Amino acid sequence: MSKRYDVPQEVMETYNYAKIETSKGTIWVKLFKDDAPNTVANFAHLANEGFYNGLKFHRVIPGFMAQGGCPNTREGASGMPGTGGPGWSIDCETDTSLHPHRRGVISMAHAGPNTGGSQFFITFVPTPHLDGVHTVFGAIDLDDKESFQVLDSITQDDDIISIEVVANKS
């Protein structure tokens, strides 16, 4: 059964940005809470609970994307990297193509429709073949050169130090 979130509007209004602290620096992502509300709520819940702290980017394909969010990449975890999740899944929110997979989008990874949980990927380049398949729930602002520099420097097994969902960039 898919997990659904019932987040009060005043709380959803604070889910504006994800601050992704990596071993290479900070990536700021603007969240699309109006277009993918359940996905953003799930990501915010996991981030605010510390789920992502200490994980790794376990799959990085140059010229495509960097994927993280698997708990099996945590120090001492026993499962295979890329196969773990939070213990639940969420439905895809891909009915509309408001946000194509351009460079710098964050999107839910999944093993098939409605199987996403905690794993996400950030695209290095436009990936239109993923439009309508994976839920885009945020993006790096196009003028945020620092975040793009950090994204471009990410390699496999780089650390996700922490992820916070915040109201404002600071």
Which stretches of residues belong to each language-model region?
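Cyclophilin-like peptidyl-prolyl cis-trans isomerases
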Residues: M1-S170
